[in-house]
From Swiss-Prot:
Regions that span the bilayer: none
Source species, domain of life: Bacteria
UniProt cross-references to Pfam families, sorted A to Z: RNA_pol_Rpb2_1 (PF04563), RNA_pol_Rpb2_2 (PF04561), RNA_pol_Rpb2_3 (PF04565), RNA_pol_Rpb2_45 (PF10385), RNA_pol_Rpb2_6 (PF00562), RNA_pol_Rpb2_7 (PF04560)
Reactions it catalyzes: RNA(n) + a ribonucleoside 5'-triphosphate = RNA(n+1) + diphosphate
Coiled coil: none
GO BP annotations, alphabetical order: DNA-templated transcription
GO MF assignments: DNA binding; DNA-directed RNA polymerase activity; ribonucleoside binding
Family annotation (InterPro entries): DNA-dir_RNA_pol_bsu_ext_1_sf (IPR042107), DNA-dir_RNA_pol_bsu_external_1 (IPR019462), DNA-dir_RNA_pol_su2 (IPR015712), DNA-dir_RNAP_su2_dom (IPR007120), DNA-dir_RNAP_su2_hyb_sf (IPR037033), RNA_pol_bsu_bac (IPR010243), RNA_pol_bsu_CS (IPR007121), RNA_pol_bsu_protrusion (IPR007644)
Summary of subunit composition and partner proteins: The RNAP catalytic core consists of 2 alpha, 1 beta, 1 beta' and 1 omega subunit. When a sigma factor is associated with the core the holoenzyme is formed, which can initiate transcription.
Protein name: DNA-directed RNA polymerase subunit beta
Organism this protein belongs to: Chlorobium luteolum (strain DSM 273 / BCRC 81028 / 2530)
Enzyme class: transferase
UniProt record similarity statement: Belongs to the RNA polymerase beta chain family.
Length: 1301
């Protein structure tokens, strides 16, 4: 057992973080629990997540208006099986969702009152439930739902340049659900509208269609109407202008329509009509100040519509590609597209983004319309009309936020476009994190429920429409499979539901904190350009600039930074300290990218005096993407920690500040691939993040409060916690063991990547513990710190060319002492199905198999635990029926004599695959059939008796604590929820009264809101105790029902499987040539040679080094951090301490030198080494020290294989490739050249014929080998026949002349 006393640690950090980093799994856990709100009482549930989805899906009515199905509330049952049971049986860890619905009906649609209502709890399916580790178990596999970074709903302004050099601007309104609408300027100075990227039409037609029917109204919206007096002096001013409104001669009835250019003749007509003034369109020329709004006038002048009807027809025709049947149809089509909340939804985020972006336009418009009485009235009328439209489509009253598009949004967008044309506004940056938001697991699940409930709603309506009888209940209408099938397919097939990377705790945690731009509704690898992949200045403190994959997904998959959190709108926030006039306050605020825009922030490293004032007059700050020098008084915010910028994996790299970004990226990624070793060892040079990652990944077991260790073994730890009746938070008062909690160790559990997860206690009997004390280590931790590799003595020097090109030379000591030995656990599964020909069977009685092969099988045909198995050994004996033909008379006679035993069965046993050997560490057998042995009735009676005893103990414990709390107290008010007095005020809590409390009816009837004793503290403790008692009673009942269910039905298995056998084989893999190793700085390599200890270079005192790295791997890679680590690691080993050097806040060059000097080592970190082979001293001094090396999960055992014969491709008839297909090694064009160069004609012919695609030749060769004959002449390869056919296809007649000359 590990010693609890850990190595002393020295921290080099100069700056302390102001706040503690949040729980690294908070992103997953909070998102899911906010979605289901399982711990929130029904009355306090907020309208979010599942509650919001269910409310939006109901009520459902039929077309006749006779039925109304309403939603009331939902609830969950507890999971039927534990997480471990689900993994073993291949089941899904889920809970059943039950929804309380109310169905009302009446005889006639025009009746006001409903005749009758039926309220019922309906089963709506099972949904996967998140484990404490932030994962889901789906069909026995642990999966993670990755958060998606996608374009935020709202409005986005962009620009493009036409080939003629003119800038064109566009505004795109992106809803959460519904049609996209885009406003675009063109080279002719007009504004067009595109809906769903279909045909375009002028924006004035859209404004006219929604209610601004006259030109004058549209022009008035943009202050483009000018009223000019009709005086002779104004003739020159008016001629050449355009009319803004119609001019009607009352006497003649003649009309001069709006948009008419005023000529001398028109001017005379207007004068003759007796008009004192005329409304014209404002003109713009270069000398005018302010905005040039001529784009609106141009658009109106080119608009072919003049009335609302014409505009509606244009909109309908362009979008539907046919004529509208009538105006009402066209109008309802437009209303459906943008003003129906069921069809079009901006979402809260979309409305928030539009409000933020166009706030100035909205306020300017409001101010402007306020002074225009008639126009204001028209605008209000249209607004009311839109609200009525929403209300008519949704059966609920309008909320505070209008989540559909309104005419005000369209006008504000046009105004912003006008500002863009005039150069008075800026376009948006689509890669800015204000325009991108995160869809976490909760939101993704909500989207699936919306789809499922929409389908269910359609089915319910169909059923209601076809029902004439009033005898119908909600349960008759709901089909649970409709919803659960959508959710199940999401978890099983979605690109964002991933098989969890479980190589080590860091890999597991990084997978949960990953943010992907891919997936449904996101980007694709092919479409994503350089800009979207690049690091953006808004990523600071939000997304890690280092950790991202190296392949085609680079920049599309990122990791959240250590302090980053996601707000309720899905935007990533990071914490900052508020700075006021140069004074750094202790106030910490969370800012999104939008909140931070235009603010001035400074790093945490700037000098601060004792009074928390910035100690210098000017500082280099950050604002937008620039780094200007600003006065201290202008600073708004300051970082909270130097680690804030990077993710957890990057924060684990010591001296990160000395590494090139590309190599740091590799270092962060390769730590995730480190295989847990036989004996874990924490780094002697760390960053201080190791403990945080180990704890938050949930791989270690932590204490839950003050107490002491009562018993500890390798299998479990028992801790007795102190019980505080008044401030009890961490421990149950009603625990029958009175504060004793047992923690079971995970032993040799297989991870998703076949690595081994195993826990071991690090506390001793009688040891005091507190909240957060590490009780047990995992296979990748030491003393509660992440331990992925080993501290080994390294020398940077070439050694006889064996470490050429990043190859690594190891000492044999690392093999003998199992320094880099790892355990890998492989799972093998066999199942029994009921086939058409009969049932399969697990058995050790297999025909034609030797006793030697069956020696390790038990009576069920399962291999015994502890057996050492190798390739082709039987793991599970299984027979399956053959397809039977009509039996012969002899067979009939045999069957009559011996029964059915002699019927044909074939051996379908499961064998150890090629290249595998190990020891069987665990076997499991599950059967759908009820367990034989003890009678089912007897088992059920035993369960009842056991749970009855537990209930009696629970009641005794409850009475004991209640007596302790209330003994000697007086009754203040003990009344029932119906107002009945249960005990007189002032009466003492005697034994008789206390005994009543444990009876269920009495307890349920008490109204605790009125108090019990009148003492607040006592009353709160009593209420907490009563709540816990009720909860535990229900828990007991559920647990009893669950156990009875399991006895009645046997083991639950996936559909179609009658029996399931699992065998786990453990392999011990030592480090060997071909294994990949790496440090934490991107310094990776493959083991090239393992030398005897005596051949390794050694120091003056005779100490041989463990590992030799090539010094040429350092300068060009620019990861100098490894040299700092090497020297400081040597000092740490000599001094017997551990160093913590946090990134951007760690040990300096001088401090490293000082520690080397303190350890009595050379300050430059170099010493003379001696050649192990000759004993001679090397010419130059060599950099020596301790570096933390990892063994990566790219092991040569998993990659190398050899093929004798095997499968061939059906198309080319050439051998397949790859280990999984038992394929061959590719012999390509350049390899052919190599053989040609050596003149190896026979080998070359063999390679290109019988070993490749000479089908006839290889069969003859096989036959010759079997018979021991000489090899025949090879035939014609299939690829030559393909060539002939291709040439024939080109019209060249080619025949093979196989006559021997």
């Amino acid at each position: 057992m590990a010693d609890a006393t850990s190595t002393p640690s020295i921290d080099f950090s100069k700056i302390q973080s102001v706040i503690e980093a949040p729980d690294l799994l908070k992103v997953q856990l909070d998102s899911f629990h906010n979605f289901i709100q399982d711990s929130v009482p029904l009355a306090k549930r907020r309208e979010q997540g599942l509650e919001k989805v269910l409310r939006s899906a109901f009520p459902i009515t039929d077309t006749r208006g006779l039925y109304l199905l309403e939603y009331i509330s939902y609830s969950f049952d507890k999971p039927k099986y534990t997480v471990e049971d689900c993994i073993e049986r291949g089941l899904t860890y889920d809970v059943s969702l039950k929804v309380k619905l109310k169905l009302s009906y009446k005889d006639e649609a025009d009746e006001t009152d409903w005749k009758e209502t039926i309220q019922q709890e309906v089963y709506l399916g099972r949904i996967p439930y998140m484990t404490e580790r932030g994962t889901f178990i789906v069909n026995g596999a642990e999966r993670v739902v990755v958060a998606q970074l996608h374009r935020s709903p709202g409005v986005v302004f962009s620009e493009a340049v036409h080939p003629n050099g003119k800038k064109m601007y566009s505004a795109k309104i992106v809803p959460t659900r519904g049609s996209w609408i885009e406003f675009q300027t063109d080279i002719n100075n007009q504004i067009f509208v595109y809906i769903d990227q279909k045909k375009n039409f002028l924006v004035t037609a859209l404004l006219r269609a929604i209610g601004f029917t006259r030109d004058e109204d549209i022009l008035g919206l943009f202050d483009l109407v000018e009223e000019v007096p009709m005086k002779a002096a104004k003739r020159e001013r008016l001629v050449g202008q355009y009319l803004a409104s119609d001019i009607v001669d009352m006497q003649t009835g003649e009309v001069v329509s709006a948009r008419t250019a005023i000529t001398e003749e028109v001017f005379e007509q207007i004068q003759a009509a007796g008009y004192k003034s005329v409304k014209i369109m404002k003109s713009f020329n270069g000398s005018d100040k302010g905005q040039d709004k001529s784009i609106v006038i141009n658009t109106i002048l080119n608009d072919s519509s003049a009335t609302e009807e014409e505009a509606l027809e244009i909109v309908y025709e362009e979008l539907r590609a046919n004529e509208a049947p009538d105006i009402d149809a066209a109008r309802s089509f437009l209303e459906r597209t943008f003003f129906n909340q069921k069809k079009y939804d901006l979402g809260e985020v979309g409305r928030y983004r539009i409000g933020k972006k166009l706030s100035r336009e909205f306020s300017e418009m409001d101010e402007y319309l306020g002074g225009k009485g008639e126009l204001k009235q028209l605008s209000d009328t249209i607004h009311q009309k839109i609200l009525q439209t929403i209300q008519s489509f949704s059966d609920e009253p309008i909320g505070e936020e209008v989540l559909v598009l309104t005419h005000l949004d369209i006008i504000a967008v046009i105004n912003y476009l006008i500002k863009l044309v005039n150069g008075q506004a800026e376009v948006d940056d689509v890669d800015h994190l204000a325009n991108r938001r995160v869809r976490s697991v909760g939101e993704q699940l909500a989207a699936q429920f919306v789809i499922g409930l929409a389908r269910m709603g359609k089915n319910v309506r169909e059923k209601l429409n076809s029902r004439d009888s009033d005898k119908i209940a909600p349960a008759d209408l709901i089909n649970a499979r409709t919803v659960s099938s959508v959710v199940s397919s999401f978890f099983a097939t979605s690109q964002l539901s991933q098989f969890m990377d479980q190589t080590n705790p860091l890999a597991e945690m990084t997978n949960k904190r990953r943010v992907s731009a891919l997936g449904p509704g996101g980007l694709t690898r092919e479409r994503a350009g350089f800009e979207v992949r690049d690091v953006h200045y808004t990523h600071y403190g939000r997304l890690c600039p280092i950790e991202t994959p190296e392949g085609p997904n680079i920049g599309l998959i990122s990791s959240l930074s250590v302090y980053a959190e996601i707000n309720d709108k899905g935007f990533i926030q990071t914490p900052y300290r508020v700075v006021e006039k140069g004074h750094v306050t202790d106030t910490v605020v969370m800012l999104s990218a939008e909140d931070e825009e235009n603010k001035i922030t400074v790093p945490v490293s700037i000098p601060i005096d004792a009074n928390n004032n910035i100690a210098v007059e000017s500082v280099q700050a950050r604002t937008k993407g620039d780094y200007p020098l600003v006065p201290s008084e202008d600073v708004n915010y300051m970082d909270v920690s130097p680690v804030q910028i990077v993710s957890a994996a990057a924060a684990l790299i010591p001296f990160l500040e000395h590494d090139d970004g590309n190599r740091a990226l590799m270092g962060a990624n390769m730590q995730r691939q480190a295989v847990p070793l036989l004996v874990s060892e924490a780094p002697v040079v760390g960053t201080g993040m190791e403990a945080k990652v180990a704890r938050d990944s949930r791989s270690v077991i932590l204490g839950e409060g003050p107490g002491f260790v009562e018993e500890v073994t390798s299998e479990f730890i028992k801790v007795r916690y102190d019980i505080d009746t008044e401030n009890n938070e961490h421990m149950s008062l009603l625990d029958p063991d009175e504060g004793l909690k047992t923690y079971r160790m995970i032993k040799f559990k297989r991870s998703n990547q076949d690595t081994c997860i195993s826990q071991r206690p690090i506390v001793k009997n009688g040891q005091k513990v507190d909240k957060g004390t590490v009780l047990a280590d995992s296979s990748s931790t030491e003393d509660g710190e992440l331990a992925l590799g080993k501290n080994v003595l390294v020398a940077f020097m070439p050694w006889r060319g064996y470490n050429f090109e990043d190859a690594i030379i190891l000492s044999e000591r690392l093999v003998y002492d199992d320094v880099f030995t790892s355990i890998h656990v492989h799972e093998f599964e066999a199942n029994v199905r009921d086939t058409k020909r009969g049932e399969e069977q697990f058995t050790r009685d297999i025909y034609n198999v030797s006793d030697e092969a069956l020696r390790n099988l038990d009576e069920n045909g399962i291999v015994r635990i502890g057996a050492e198995v190798k390739e082709r050994d039987i793991l599970v004996g299984k027979i399956t029926p053959k397809g039977e033909s009509d039996p012969t008379p002899e067979e009939k006679l045999l069957r009559a004599i011996f029964g059915d035993k002699s019927s044909d069965v074939k051996d379908a046993s499961m064998h150890v695959p090629a290249g595998m050997k190990g020891i069987v560490i665990k076997t499991k057998l599950f059967s759908r059939k009820k367990k034989v042995g003890m009678d089912v009735k007897e088992k059920l009676e035993l369960i009842d008796a056991r749970f009855e005893r537990r209930e009696i103990e629970l009641r005794k414990s409850f009475e004991k604590w209640l007596r302790q709390m209330l003994q000697g107290k007086k009754v203040k008010g003990l009344t029932s929820d119906k107002g009945k007095v249960l005990a007189d005020e002032g009466a003492a809590f005697d034994d008789a009264l206390l005994a009543k409390f444990s009876s269920q009816p009495f307890l349920e009837s008490i109204d605790f809101t009125l108090g019990v004793t009148g003492t607040k503290k006592v009353d709160e403790a009593v209420i907490r105790l009563v709540k816990e008692f009720r909860f535990k009673l229900k828990d007991l009942a559920d647990e009893r029902d669950n156990e009875k269910y399991k006895v009645n039905v046997g083991d639950e298995l996936p559909p179609g499987i009658e029996e399931l056998a699992k065998v786990y084989i453990a392999q011990k893999r030592k480090i060997q040539v071909g294994d990949k190793m790496a440090g934490r700085h991107g310094n990776k390599g493959v083991v090239g040679k393992i030398l005897p200890i005596e051949d390794m270079p050694f120091m003056a005192d005779g100490t041989p080094v463990d590992i030799v790295l090539n010094p040429l791997g350092v300068p060009s890679r620019m990861n100098i951090g490894q040299l700092y680590e090497t020297s400081l690691g040597w000092a740490a080993k000599k001094l017997g301490v551990k160093f913590k050097t946090p990134i951007f806040n760690g040990a300096t060059y001088e401090e490293v030198q000082a520690e080397l000097e303190r350890a009595g080592l050379p300050m430059h970190g170099k010493v003379r080494l001696y050649d192990g082979r000759t004993g001679e001293q090397f010419d130059d001094e060599v950099t020596v020290g301790y570096i933390y090396m990892l063994k990566l999960s790219h092991l040569v055992d998993d990659k190398i294989h050899a093929r004798s014969t095997g499968p061939y491709s059906l198309i080319t008839q050439q051998p397949l490739g790859g280990k999984a297909q038992f394929g061959g090694q590719r012999f390509g064009e350049m390899e052919v050249w190599a053989l040609e160069a050596y003149g190896a004609a026979n080998i070359l012919r063999e390679m290109l014929t019988v070993k490749s695609d000479d089908v006839v030749g290889r069969n003859k060769t096989y036959e010759a080998i079997v018979k021991g004959q000489n090899l025949p002449e090879p035939g014609i390869p299939e690829s030559f026949n393909v060539l002939i056919r291709e040439l024939q296809g080109l019209g060249l007649e080619i025949r093979i002349d196989d006559r021997v000359p």
